[in-house]
From Swiss-Prot:
NCBIfam families: S15_bact. Part of the 30S ribosomal subunit. Forms a bridge to the 50S subunit in the 70S ribosome, contacting the 23S rRNA. One of its GO terms (cellular component) is cytosolic small ribosomal subunit. The gene is rpsO. It comes from Methylococcus capsulatus (strain ATCC 33009 / NCIMB 11132 / Bath). Keywords: Ribonucleoprotein, Ribosomal protein, RNA-binding, rRNA-binding. This is Small ribosomal subunit protein uS15. Pfam families: Ribosomal_S15. One of the primary rRNA binding proteins, it binds directly to 16S rRNA where it helps nucleate assembly of the platform of the 30S subunit by binding and bridging several RNA helices of the 16S rRNA.
Length: 89
């Protein structure tokens, strides 16, 4: 796995909306972003690893869908999350 349970719990605590919240879009997007950032350097070294690239694209698409959902339901939370994660320029 990309990161340990301790690292995962730190991310959850940072982005949770209420104590024990692990399912909110903010937490899910933050965890996916962490996994994406962990996997991305692998593809600089291994340009032809298409099998793993497919998994990375799956994660990116899942994050995009969650961000689209958040943008459509609560635009202010979306903008705050984008700013905190540094996803858009």
């Amino acid at each position: 796995m990309a990161f340990t349970a301790a690292e995962k719990s730190v991310i959850v605590q940072e982005f949770q909306r209420a104590p024990g919240d692990t399912g909110s879009p903010e937490v899910q997007v933050a965890l996916l972003t962490n996994r994406i950032n962990y996997l991305t350097p692998h593809f600089v070294k291994h340009k032809k690893d298409f099998h793993s690239r497919r998994g990375l694209l799956r994660l990116v698409n899942q994050r995009r869908k969650l961000l689209d959902y958040l943008k459509n339901t609560d635009n202010e939370r979306y903008r705050t999350l984008i700013e905190r994660l540094g996803l858009r320029k």
